[in-house]
Each structure stands twice: as C-alpha cells, then as structure tokens.
C-alpha cells in the first residue's frame, strides 16, 4: 500500500546506437526504486553496452543485469557476425530474454519483454531492439514488448529498445 504523498520520479533517457565506447541509457527512479538504463548498441566494432546488441564485426552483445541486482534487470544482447552479404548485428536484450545473434543474411531479433497488469490489463513491455545490418535492409525485428525494428524507435512508454540503423 502506498501512502498519499509526493514521490520523486525520474524517467531515464534511452541509450544511443554508437560507434565509440559503451553508452548506456540513464536510470529511471521512483522514490527509492532505481531501474538501470538500457545498453547502447555498436555501430562498427565492439560489444554493446549492458544488454545492447553487438556490432557486425563478430562482437559480443552487452551483458544484461549490469551491475548485478536482484531481481535481475535486463538480459544479454546478441552477438554480431562478420559474414557477407548482410553482416548482421546482434539484437538487444529484452526485459524477459536475451537478444538473438545476427547472421549473414539479417540482424538478430531483439529479446522479448515481460508482461504485467499494472494498468488493469496485461501489457508486454521492455522488448529489445532489433540488430541492424551493414550491407542491406534486412535488420532484425524488435522483441515483443515494443522493441523497434531496424532504424525504428521503440514504442513510447514501454521501456523498449530501438532498432539499430544501417
């Protein structure tokens, strides 16, 4: 039961896709509860941030739930692959499961979100973003729960990841 009073709420910003170092999204805070921001994906080389997908250069996805907390927050991102013709990047991890690896023909799909009924009916939120491709339009689909496909933002107010761009 919650007391009738003012509560501090901070809505964290999303993580960017990046070609440089790991750049995670900022944390969200409700009173004394903090939820870690999602991990950024990679553009050309290197691992993604916490839960972000890996690049096309056979780089691993970021590790979810980092730093580790209980209950866990987020899942691992998929691994990218350096293989023609598409050089698929890994999908981002979702709240309910890991992102999938990329392959030679497409980016990996994002991991699934999780369902809850906080609004009175079951809604799935927190899907991972789809992995992009280097040489074509065959990006991975966003994970169930609002994850965006290639070059598409995650669905607003779902905590979902956006898809990587080409």
Segments from the language model and where they lie:
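Low-complexity, glycine/proline-biased repetitive segments and flexible coils/loops
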Residues: 1-166
């Amino acid at each position: 039961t919650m007391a009738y009073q003012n509560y501090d709420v901070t809505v964290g910003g999303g993580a960017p896709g990046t070609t440089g170092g790991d750049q995670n999204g900022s944390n969200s805070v409700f009173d004394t509860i903090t939820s870690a921001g999602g991990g950024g994906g990679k553009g050309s080389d290197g691992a993604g941030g916490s839960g972000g997908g890996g690049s096309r250069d056979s780089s691993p996805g970021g590790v979810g739930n980092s730093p580790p907390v209980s209950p866990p927050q987020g899942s691992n991102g998929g691994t990218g692959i350096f293989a023609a013709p598409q050089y698929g990047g890994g999908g981002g991890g979702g709240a309910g499961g890991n992102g999938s690896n990329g392959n030679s023909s497409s980016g990996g799909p994002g991991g699934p979100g999780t369902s809850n009924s906080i609004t009175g009916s079951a809604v799935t939120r927190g899907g991972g973003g789809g992995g992009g491709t280097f040489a074509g339009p065959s990006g991975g689909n966003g994970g169930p729960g609002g994850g965006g496909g290639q070059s598409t933002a995650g669905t607003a107010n779902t905590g979902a990841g956006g898809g990587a761009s080409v």
